[in-house]
UniProtKB/Swiss-Prot annotation:
The record marks 316 as: Arginine finger. Residues 523-552, 582-609 are annotated as: Disordered. SMART domains: RhoGAP, SH3. The keyword Membrane does not apply. Functions as a GTPase-activating protein (GAP) for ced-10/RAC-1 and CDC42. One of its GO terms (biological process) is signal transduction. PANTHER family: CDC42 GTPASE-ACTIVATING PROTEIN (PTHR15729), GTPASE-ACTIVATING PROTEIN CDGAPR (PTHR15729:SF10). PROSITE patterns: RHOGAP, SH3. The lineage of its organism: Eukaryota, Metazoa, Ecdysozoa, Nematoda, Chromadorea. Residues 165-244 form the SH3 domain. Pfam families: RhoGAP, SH3_2. Keywords: GTPase activation, SH3 domain. The gene is rrc-1. Residues 281-463 form the Rho-GAP domain. This is GTPase-activating protein rrc-1.
Amino acid sequence: MIDGVEESDAPLSPKSPFARRNGRSLRIQRLVDCQHFHYTTVELGPVKVVIIAINTDENATERIKMRVESESNSWLVERSREDWAVFDRQLHRCVFERRHSRLDELFPLIHLESAKFEEVLVKYTERLSELTGSIITCYPVLKFLEIDSRGGHFEPAEETSINVPAIAAAVVTKDFEPTDNSQLRLRVGDIVSITEMSTASPNEQTFWKAKLTISNQKIVDPQNGHLGFEIGYFPRDCVMLIDDKRLPNPLNTEPKPAPRNARRYMTTMFRNRRREPIFGLELTELFMRTGKRVPVIVERCCAAIEDQGIVTGIYRQCGIQSNIQRLRAKFDSGAEPDLHEFGQRDIYSVSSLLKQYFRQLPNPLFTYQAYPALIETFEKEESVEEKVESLRFLLEAMPEHLSRLCKSKSLTDMTSKNLAIVWSPNLFRPPPTLNGADAHLLSGLNVHTAICDFCIENSDSLFICDIDEEQSKCTSIENSFTTISKSATMSDMRSESDSRWPRFFRGKSVEGFWKFNRKQQTSTGELCGSPPSEVKWRSRSTRSHSTDATFQSSRADSFMQLMHTGMDQIREGMRIFRARARSMRPTSRPPPSPRTRRARFSNGGGANNVQRVNERERDIQIELPLATAESSITPEPRSTMDSNNIMTRTVSVNDSDDASFEENGLKEIRERKVMFKAATQEHVAPIHERSSPVEEWSSDSRESLHLEMSRYDNVSPSGTITRSQREPISNLSPAAQLLFFESSRASQLFSA
């Protein structure tokens, strides 16, 4: 026996929960979904079944009404003739054998008259009541009688009144005492959920069926001890619907109908109507809708980028995706966001939005129809002038926006080649193929980039409509020294600020930044021109006002960034600051060379030797007028140099060096690096171009060129004494000779 059922060759029903438990499926099955299974254990007492009557409903269907009594509880059950026949077969298939139960088979008798069939059922239920007990474990048999495995009342979920959805809610306004078991006891203040509402009749009292949802007295089920729910009928005049529109008005006044303004209603409706987005829309359709040849988004984005987008990496760096989506939503809804104000915070999002618009065009700017002719024209072996003439007939309109940005490549680091690489996938796309293959998309990337680069470089010749250069906000900085409008870049705004900070913060970098306006008042030629008297070994190019302001502010920002770092970095920075300041003083001597240090202790380390070495190692500083210096050692001529400028030279003499350079009794002079320093600081050296916008932090202890180098790298090639310059030195007067060399060494040199 397995679960009270004899073993048989027939497999378990797939609807049985035991079959599903032994199978692969572990999904929990509802009891209602299981058609046939047997309980493992059943606790049933005597069950009594009594036939009450056979009634006919409105549909002329017979319903056999019976009462089931179990565990001192009773309930009514209605079944049809077919249900009784199925129950009889299931009972004798799983529980009893007919020869032992001695019950009549009901299936052949379902066609009898109602009276005769009722007599058969009365005898059947009397015999069944004698056989019931814990032997019945079949779920379909117990379900027919609405009995659970413990003998309680079991009602399937689909037949339970508590699960019937409510159609209205009402509050009780009058107490009601039930006169039948099917009626519901009500108290004032209770809330019921109505499940059945019958139509009102003029002469009879109307009853509704409802579930008692909220009651003043808790109802406890005596069977399981849990909170129970009451379901029953009650008179409709005892409750008032919560959403009843016929509630009495305390003011006894009817609300006035709100006037409807048709014009305002239509305006609001059309204003709130969802607009068709402009992204992904054909340019021809957009022109028919707005009547503008150039879309508004292109005009606004180009104006904002030309005004505030002259920054490094424009169109190459991507903006913040959330900002891009926000701007796109505003343009799609028909609004025009303020890109001028938005560009001050994130100009890269504006450039990314413009690229996204061209990339999502169904037909690109260079259309599929013109694509074959464009490729064929560009790939012809012609000169630049001939290609310009050929392409001019193909291109009707193209924004000169990229060409203007190309002129500012020193500020944006975006040449025509870089702009072409970024923009060619957005402007050129080959026509789609019939088979839908995408392999052809990569075949023309180089050609697309070359065409875009050619159009940017030759935009002035390709397009007939010339734009007034005075109206352009971007100017060329390659051919002449020009300035951008003051509102163009943030560097210009910062250069005009005139804050007075304490002298403590004014290092070399900050001092140059604060004196920038005074430099502009000087002659433009001093900054822009390239006089022949300037240093020849440094190539430089003219720059714009914005470039100089950027370089000056970057040096100031680097100093302020150091002031905001941690204490450890501040200590390290001050240590380097003091070391550099000491090393750059004109009167500071360089550290002794390793050869000098070896010579000090090579002879025993005596005091006399040390004193002798120190005497020979001393530095001789000679100050001569500039005219004398030019006659002896020829530095670069400077037209603006003052006559009071002095030249400082340091020459160290070492005995160990004498032997290495002595040849045929003639002392050779070793090559020395010298540094020339102007006594006056009126001349301001120009700012030179750098490969990086951020220079190394400079100190305030020296006055040198802004390009950071070591202290001996600023020397003119003609300012060093080489072997070829021994003859001009020998032609000096004896006084000048003694100024440069010691007397003993000078006598040996000139006597030779």
